[in-house]
Swiss-Prot record:
InterPro entries: Cwf19-like (IPR040194), Cwf19-like_C_dom-1 (IPR006768), Cwf19-like_C_dom-2 (IPR006767), HIT-like_sf (IPR036265)
One of the GO BP terms on file: mRNA splicing, via spliceosome
Species classification: Eukaryota, Metazoa, Chordata, Craniata, Vertebrata
Annotated family: Belongs to the CWF19 family.
Underlying gene: CWF19L1
Tissue expression per record: Expressed in many brain regions, including cerebellum, thalamus and occipital, parietal and temporal lobes (at protein level). Also expressed in the spinal cord (at protein level).
GO cellular component, one term: post-mRNA release spliceosomal complex
Annotated stretches, region: Disordered: 298-324
Domain of life: Eukaryota
Protein name in the entry: CWF19-like protein 1
Disease: Spinocerebellar ataxia, autosomal recessive, 17: A form of spinocerebellar ataxia, a clinically and genetically heterogeneous group of cerebellar disorders. Patients show progressive incoordination of gait and often poor coordination of hands, speech and eye movements, due to degeneration of the cerebellum with variable involvement of the brainstem and spinal cord.
Length: 538
């Protein structure tokens, strides 16, 4: 079965014209259906019109699509980007960060580099340096398995991009743009590369990433420069396209060459030779944004040098999770843990029966170390959390049950992923989703559906309070907690007449049983779960 393509929009310089942009996006979606993401390059903010931005910042208005933006290109707009590692600017609008790799739950890989080129030290807050470009290349290009990335986002054009290609109009690509971006594009081999800043639209003919008859065929790259939003000449500033992540594509299909493909504009331009030594110098530690894909089974955290922690000959010691300020009921090494409830132990996580559970097989996935929420987990812990979730889904499905997972990062000190089975005979996944949405509306809780190909780490920052629920279908609902939040909300929904029909069990304190009964349930669960226990494979 063919993989369903993602539908994306890319945009040039917004320059503070948010209403024009988002009204246009709404019109496109009304006509052509919803898109998954909007990617903005160039200047997102302008020098004026702060009043318009305030409406989005305060929630009076909301972007109609999950939007990711690059950072400042001048000193004037640095003030809008408070966190170099990326942050949420407004609801549905996220600043990616100065540089890094963004991987969606679909496997789509986007590399981003904010700012303009600077060869001076110290580097201004709105610029990138040769070291920044080198670190991005080393993150990916040092492994023999590397084939390229899906999308590259930069604000400046790459220098000499017009070589061997169609005319770029009034822009002289030999003088305009960044040689560092040219080098980055050469190394990363993006399938799509978007840029802006030149107030014009230019879609270059696709170029090849291999030398004919000397190298194996590789995919082609399409470079698209976009104009500024609302420009009077009506130059194109929005670009719609569909893409299947390259990791999911058949190799032969991926490397098919378009009929109008050209030579690589950078290979013979001398750009790589002239700056190669400069950008491939050793990289110092630097702040670099990483998004960990909760559905990326092989996800690994890369250091700012780009070396894979599992393959480096001199790996750094993994950073220990933060220590709890006092006794913690859920840190596995803590004497406060009720160890008779523990039913399975992995390398980074463990499984325990819930105390006062909604059912006899209501379990928790917990990190062994002290982490407060999913968004704070390291890559290796995320990977094992996902492994437990997938295994529990198979386990419960074999027993005729759905699997509902939720997290409440509010008034809790240690991550607890609640995993509650719901008999398939009781409810459909649509029933479960509707129950959450209905009860949220009744309690004036804004429960939003996360776009299918986003994950929670892209929406919530470490330390932010939130509630999050995930269904067997992969659908995810999210609420950003701003003030008060009912602590038992997740249980109340599942205990309601619409789902499990045990409303008297909405509070766990009313469901406690004796330690002997808990031990009996734990023994039974261990025995039933054993055929699915992936820890026995190690």
């Amino acid at each position: 079965m063919a993989q369903k393509p993602l539908r994306l929009l890319a945009c040039g310089d917004v320059e503070g014209k948010f209403d024009i942009l988002f009204n246009r996006v709404q019109a496109i979606q009304k006509k052509s259906g919803n898109f998954d993401l909007l990617l903005c390059v160039g200047n997102f903010f302008g020098s004026t019109q702060d009043a318009e931005w305030e409406e989005y910042k305060t929630g009076i208005k909301k972007a109609p699509i999950q939007t990711y933006v690059l950072g400042a290109n001048n000193q004037e707009t640095v003030k809008y980007f408070q966190d170099a590692d990326g942050c949420e600017l407004a609801e549905n609008i996220t600043y990616l960060g100065r540089k890094g790799i963004f991987t969606g739950s679909s496997g789509l890989q986007i590399v981003y580099l904010s700012g303009t080129e600077s060869l001076n030290e110290p580097v201004p807050g709105y610029s990138f340096s040769p070291k920044d470009v080198s670190s991005l290349r080393m993150m990916l290009c040092t492994t023999s398995q590397f084939k390229g990335v899906d999308i590259l986002l930069t604000s400046p054009w790459p220098k000499c991009v017009g070589n061997f290609g169609n005319s770029s109009g009034e822009v002289d690509t030999k003088k305009c743009g960044s040689a560092l971006v040219s080098s980055l594009a050469t190394g990363l081999k993006p399938r799509y590369h978007f840029a802006a800043l030149e107030k014009t639209y230019y879609e270059r003919l696709p170029y090849r990433n291999h030398i004919i008859l000397q190298e194996n065929a590789q995919h082609a790259t399409r470079f698209i420069a976009l104009a500024n939003v609302g420009n009077p000449e009506k130059k194109k500033y929005l670009y719609a396209f569909s893409i299947v992540p390259m990791k999911l594509m058949d190799a032969a299909e991926l490397v098919k060459q378009p009929p109008d493909v050209t030579e690589n504009p950078y290979r013979k331009s001398g750009q790589e030779a002239s700056i190669g030594k400069q950008i491939l110098a050793p990289v110092e530690e630097s702040a670099c944004q990483f998004f960990f894909d909760l559905n990326e089974k092989q996800g690994r955290k890369r250091s700012s040098t780009g070396r894979d922690s599992k393959s480096s000959p001199h790996p750094k010691q993994p950073r220990k999770p933060p220590q709890p300020p006092g006794p913690c009921w859920f840190c596995l090494a803590s004497p406060e843990v009720e160890k008779h409830l523990v039913v399975n132990i992995g390398t980074h996580c463990y499984l325990a029966l819930a105390k006062g559970g909604l059912s006899d097989d209501h379990v928790l996935i917990l990190p062994i170390g002290h982490y407060q929420s999913v968004v704070e987990l390291s890559a290796e812990v995320v990977e094992e959390v996902e492994k437990y979730k997938a295994t529990l889904r198979r386990f419960f499905k074999s027993r005729g049950k759905w699997c509902v997972v939720f997290e409440r990062n509010y008034k809790s000190h240690h991550l607890q992923l609640q995993v509650i089975p719901v008999p398939i005979s009781c409810s459909t996944t649509d029933d479960i989703k509707d129950a959450f949405i209905t009860q949220a509306q009744e309690q004036q809780i804004e429960l939003l559906e996360i776009p299918e190909h986003s994950d929670i780490k892209q929406i919530a920052q470490p330390g932010a309070a939130y509630f999050y629920v995930e269904l067997d279908t992969g659908e995810k609902l999210f609420h950003r907690i701003k003030k008060n939040f009912p602590l038992q909300f997740g249980r109340e929904v599942l205990a309601s007449e619409a789902i499990l029909n045990v409303p008297d069990k909405s509070d766990w304190r009313q469901c406690q049983i004796s330690k002997e009964d808990e031990e009996t349930l734990a023994r039974r669960f261990r025995k039933d779960f054993e055929p699915y226990d992936f820890t026995l494979d190690d």
